[in-house]
Amino acid sequence: MFTHAHADHIFGLDDLRLFPFYLGHPVPLYCEPAVETAIRTTFAYAFDSRPATHAGAVPKLAIHSIDTRPLEILGTTVLPLRLKHGPRFEVLGYRIGNVAYCTDTNEIPDETWPHLQGLDVLILDALRNRPHATHFCLDEAIAVAEQVGAKRTFFTHLSHDFDYQATNAGLPKGMELAY
């Protein structure tokens, strides 16, 4: 499940090349059409119709186009969540059961807030201590986490600005930096 097509979110795709060998089928990918276009362009060799030279030569991928409607993956309902990654770019977060994953965001649109209620776990972007144009900074992320009210919040997509131990020691109860 892809959130968006930035390099730090799709460039590891080639590392999946052996997974189809063990799975016995192509690796299913779930993404919006714009992300699919970026994947097909960036990893064109993975979609080449010529036979591969050996089992791990190229990743075998099966792309499933999604939007913000709920879908079922491996018997579990997944709800894609619309998020803003700066003023002009939209990405997806995901809610799976009582867990929500919301990274690369600095704004949660009004229509997404109701889907963040009743969470056990919130995984939320908190890039650094200083404000950023396209990511929540830590203070913004704490405010969002408090508004969501999940039992536990893990901050992710962290820069090297943080002293892990010192920052965790100063966070509100139920909130911590992820690794």
Residue ranges of each PLM-predicted region?
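Binuclear metal-dependent hydrolase catalytic cores
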Residues: 1-102, 111, 168-179
